[in-house]
Amino acid sequence: VTLLFAHAYLACPPLRQDPLLATVFSLLVVFGVCCWIYASFLQRFVFKGQRMVVTGVRSLASKTVEITMEPSDDKPLHKGRPGQYVALSAPGVVNGPHPFTEVSAPGRDVMQVAIKVSGIDTRVLREKVGVGMEVKVRGPYGDLDLRRATPRQVWIAAGIGITPFVAWLRAIDELINEKIRRSGVSSSKIRKVASQEVIDQLGLDTVDMWFFHHGEPAYAEELYYWEDRFSWLEVHIRDTTESERQSAAEIIAETPGLDIDHLDGVSAVICGPKTMMRRYSRDLRSLGVHPIIREDFSFR
């Protein structure tokens, strides 16, 4: 963009002759150059975060790994809500911090994030990440809170956008386990009671999870595991290398128990590429689905 502004300034004499336009374009070019210098060279020194060390690397798919990290000092681990993400920087490996969703269950003294190759920096990080690597983590950020949804929910994820939902499912299981531990008794009956208490606490009734991947079924086995474990969850996984992603209307039509003409009380939670989220948000809203919750990776 900076080069385009510079080219327009040099190639268009009227811009140089008009004092106001010349000043505006000059400031834009200088601002762009400063942003590039900061992102390419200075950000790695300015970026502040908790120092951590990689203690585990697990391959999820050909382009996706899950890394486990622990604090490299005595400072307590900064844990966020399920579904939030952190900004991770690997000095000497990538130029600056990148957002990755935290997928570790609450109550653990480790942090886990999933990394999928989506550009040069993530490719380098995917190839070089290993046990013992030092990283910096800042955050958590984000406001993807499923508690804002209605009891009848439709979850839609694409690609690495599955990670916030994995985090929530792990968190729900940990909440159930915590109630069982507090009871002092472990049995299938106690687990059923604890599960119902957690579901009532979260305001959940029925959830249909739609996961679209492009030949990268990261966490697919785990999703089926949660489907078997949670009676309120039904999982639908589609490979977009074999067929196109369903439209919003098709998702509603193929979701058991939903009537496209009567969607009162149905909410949707969406995470994935921005264009996908915008399209599904628009189309689901036009069908009467409300509220629609999505993660826009906002730093708040």
Residue ranges of model-derived segments:
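Conserved beta-strand elements of the Class I
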Residues: 152-156, 267-269
